[in-house]
Amino acid sequence: MELQLTGKESGWWIVSHENKLWLPKGELPQGNAANWSLQGTTARQIGEWQGQSVWLIRQMMPSGMGSVRQLLDVDRGLFQLAGRGVQLAEFYRSHRFCGYCGHEMHASRTEWASLCNHCRERYYPQIAPCVIVAIRRGDEILLAQHVRHRGGINTVLAGFVEVGETLEQAVSREVLEESNIHIKNLRYVTSQPWPFPHSLMMAFMADYDSGELCHDPKELLNAGWYRYDQLPLLPPPGTVARRLIEDTVVLCREHSDLSQ
């Protein structure tokens, strides 16, 4: 439920507009609303963090707007809450009017949804399921540089789940399309909400089965097998890609030790 702030409310403040996040001094604001001159604005509680309320305010600030990526190395829980806030703010901004009848909508008081009083249509935030997989071949891991990545970062393969696919089918298809190889021993590891803009990353590990590596130039700048102790520039800590790589490195090292 939304409320107008008096200035006495306290907690963490997620102020977001158009996928941007207010980060004065490079940090998420914390404390009383009055300390950040937020009194008089409309806010909605979207969770709790370390025993304090987390508030969402949907508006643009004159300065200090940044990316939720800046919170990646702060704390996973806080990053996820901030990501939720950014996604909700964008959802409500883009769902002011009903896509069926064109009438103005309002936010539900009981769930994350926008409601139309005219035709009774109900809209929920969009979530795009993605698969991401680390592939091992002996003491090597398959890493690639994606065309959309900057700074020379090499990472594992990933892609969106298509309509009618299982997660397992999506992994096998993406790997074959991007690298021309087949995999085996696919196993689920973990998941991570990824608000860029609204993905849910489902992480897997797999072993190489067959095929000659040949990367898809439309998706990848390059791809190669890297020995576990000779890795290129990797994704930052806090990302599910980095965890997959680190977990696979452990298996590569064990394989190398057994081979000696």
From Swiss-Prot:
GN (gene name): nudC
Which keywords has UniProt assigned to this entry?
Hydrolase, Magnesium, Manganese, Metal-binding, NAD, Zinc
Family statement drawn from the similarity comment of this UniProt entry = Belongs to the Nudix hydrolase family. NudC subfamily.
Chain residues that bind a divalent metal cation 1? 158, 178, 219
GO terms of biological process kind: NAD catabolic process; NADH metabolic process; NADP catabolic process
Alphabetically, the GO molecular function entries are: magnesium ion binding; manganese ion binding; NAD+ diphosphatase activity; NADH pyrophosphatase activity; RNA NAD-cap (NMN-forming) hydrolase activity; zinc ion binding
Write down the species: Yersinia pestis (strain Pestoides F)
User: Where does the sequence pass through the membrane?
Assistant: none
- Which reaction is recorded as catalysed by this protein? a 5'-end NAD(+)-phospho-ribonucleoside in mRNA + H2O = a 5'-end phospho-adenosine-phospho-ribonucleoside in mRNA + beta-nicotinamide D-ribonucleotide + 2 H(+); NAD(+) + H2O = beta-nicotinamide D-ribonucleotide + AMP + 2 H(+); NADH + H2O = reduced beta-nicotinamide D-ribonucleotide + AMP + 2 H(+)
Q: Which domain of life is it from?
A: Bacteria
Q: How is the cofactor bound?
A: Divalent metal cations. Mg(2+) or Mn(2+). Binds 1 zinc ion per subunit.
Q: What is this protein called?
A: NAD-capped RNA hydrolase NudC
How far does the signal peptide extend, from start to end residue?
none
Q: Which residues bind Zn(2+)?
A: 98, 101, 116, 119
> Which prosthetic group or cofactor does it need?
Mg(2+); Mn(2+); Zn(2+)
